[in-house]
Amino acid sequence: LVLTDCLGLDREYVTSMRGALPATRFAVEAYVRFVVEQPLVIAVASSLTELFAPSIHRERIAGMLANYDFVNDDVMAYFKRRLSQAPRDASFALEFIKTNARTREMQEACVDAVRFKCNVLWAQLDALYLAYVQGMVPPGAYKPE
């Protein structure tokens, strides 16, 4: 919310999710359903995308600070915290999986969970690109002025 506040978006509008891209809403709902319905070890495995978060966040923080004068360190605080939190989260998840995914079948299901999460993330990126780079914003989704 700090980032959307900085962007000048109305907080009630943001939290209502009225302007969310349909693909983003669908992807988030699919991911939540996935982690609720799967065995704990598989749900935890899906979080291993966090292994790559620090390098991605470092790049995004630098880009945002360099290219947008309205973005400052306070706005980037969440992402900066993730630089140290994400490796701890991923390390915990990896140890949990190594301890609890005892069969080949369970280990393969854990790998599939990471693939699923990557697909969820790609679906969101595709939707963002189509809407805000190609200009094909779906009806009802946020449309920058």
Which residues does each PLM region occupy?
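A short secondary-structure junction motif
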Residues: R60, M64, A93-F96, N100, ...
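Residue-level detector of solvent-exposed, low-hydrophobicity positions
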Residues: R33, E59, Q85-A86, T103, ...
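Long amphipathic all-alpha helical oligomerization modules
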Residues: F79, L83, P87-V111
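Generic structural signal for well-ordered, non-transmembrane alpha-helical segments
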Residues: L1, D5, P22, L51-S55, ...
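General N-terminal targeting signals
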Residues: L48, F70, E95-F96, V114, ...
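Active-site-proximal alpha-helical scaffolds that flank and shape metal-associated catalytic sites
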Residues: L1-Y78, V133, A141-P144
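Acidic, carboxylate-rich catalytic segments that either coordinate divalent cations
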Residues: R104-E145
